[in-house]
Amino acid sequence: MAGLLSTFDTFSSRRSESINKSGGGAVIPGQRSTVSVFVLGPSVTDDADKLSIATTFLAHSLDTDKQHSQRGGFLVSLLAMAYSSPELYLTTNGVNADVKYVIYNIEKDPKRTKTDGFIVKTRDMEYERTTEWLFGPMVNKSPLFQGQRDAADPDTLLQIYGYPACLGAIIVQVWIVLVKAITSSAGLRKGFFNRLEAFRQDGTVKGALVFTGETVEGIGSVMRSQQSLVSLMVETLVTMNTARSDLTTLEKNIQIVGNYIRDAGLASFMNTIKYGVETKMAALTLSNLRPDINKLRSLIDTYLSKGPRAPFICILKDPVHGEFAPGNYPALWSYAMGVAVVQNKAMQQYVTGRTYLDMEMFLLGQAVAKDAESKISSALEDELGVTDTAKERLRHHLANLSGGDGAYHKPTGGGAIEVALDNADIDLEPEAHTDQDARGWGGDSGDRWARSMGSGHFITLHGAERLEEETNDEDVSDIERRIARRLAERRQEDATTHEDEGRNNGVDHDEEDDAAAAAGMGGI
């Protein structure tokens, strides 16, 4: 029997391995598109000319009249300006199954009177029409930088801070866009400016060179449509040797942004490991968590098999990245989120109100995280030499810290109401009532309210599920206000104990409906 069970335990990981394993056969190349990339030739030496070309590349990448492949090529041209040998940069990181990069040089000819003296050429010939297309008059539909709205002069910044700092400010912002462009496009602007703030405070990005919201959205749309551009940026992070002692300031800043890009889109997977498994609480022994634990073990093996590109499987759109979605291990994820909202206040803002949330496991996670005994790791007791007296005192302190806090956090996001019912008892045990009573919908509403009051404001999970069907989203704000008012009245009534029974029976029955409806909108 033990051998049979071990076979089932390893089936998930072995199944994933067999799916991802190559079946052999010939490798048939796919169709590749040609993308033009422009690099600076040795005759372009003036810093003002270089910065002008950089902003020209940025402007073309935002031109909605151009094809997305062309716009992506201009962003590649801009990123390549960070290196003394753009050709080597593209050769090292630009090998891609989707595109073939064709490199053109931009040279400066003092004898030319048009296009500011610039000419596009290769080793064999000059491209006059391409030059006019690249450097001809262009109308920006919106400002590239916020400083342009304030009539700030980038040339002044160039004189004060120098060309490398100004170019670095532009390129770093392109990298910051990648953090949210693929995995959270709806929150792109907010996420961009949140990440940018650290670089503004340390002076990396000057105010006059901060992208406008329209610029951020434009770059993000190109990144979402041009996977080859994203692959180039990921390869840049993978191949960049961080052990070098001669990293430029721009390369260091790219690595800092890279820390945000790594594991983008894998937050649920990482948080499940952190709060669900690494906390090593006794709840992991539950049989209904066993399948999800096996699934998580399989996903860990898959993740590690990807090597240095594993943190980027979501933004690279690796075929296996969908397997890491929390809907594939809902019970364990729900339990982990329950632990997380108790142990980490910041996680209370994390969106947990999803369709696959297992409410009982979510509440169980909160319950075990609040339990003083569960907070003590037996694995470290012997290693740290903790005495029995010290453990008892620690339990005493933990009990005092959590004493009186009976509130359970509701799921956030979706249709959930982000309020907690103070001192609400949560029943996680199976109920022995009839189906009608288990749903909290007995025939006599007065009896129901009396039972609820007598059990410390008891609300069942089954009642919450039943009420969810009868609660509209439009009622949310009104329900929140009434809950706050009723809870205040309830605390006042609890303070005046030993009241006559008649007063308790006279409580407005709407209070029960408010609390129960709140449970239906997000669960308690």
UniProtKB/Swiss-Prot annotation:
Residues 487-524 are annotated as: Disordered. Residues 440-461 are annotated as: Homomultimerization. Its main location: virion. It is found in: Virion; Host cytoplasm. One of its GO terms (cellular component) is host cell cytoplasm. The keyword Ubl conjugation does not apply. Residues 462-471 are annotated as: Interaction with the phosphoprotein. Residues 487-508 have a biased composition (Basic and acidic residues). It comes from the Viruses. Residues 1-404 are annotated as: Ncore. Ncore is globular and carries regions required for self-assembly and RNA-binding. Ntail is an intrinsically disordered monomeric domain in the C-terminus. Forms the helical nucleocapsid (NC) in a ratio of 1 N per 6 ribonucleotides, protecting the genome from nucleases. The encapsidated genomic RNA serves as template for transcription and replication; encapsidation by N is coupled to RNA synthesis. Forms the encapsidation complex with the phosphoprotein protein P. Before encapsidation, the newly synthesized free N protein, so-called N0, is chaperoned by P. Most abundant protein in the virion. Since the viral RNA genome consists of 15,383 bases,there are 2564 molecules per encapsidated genome. This is Nucleoprotein. It comes from Sendai virus (strain Ohita) (SeV). The gene is N.
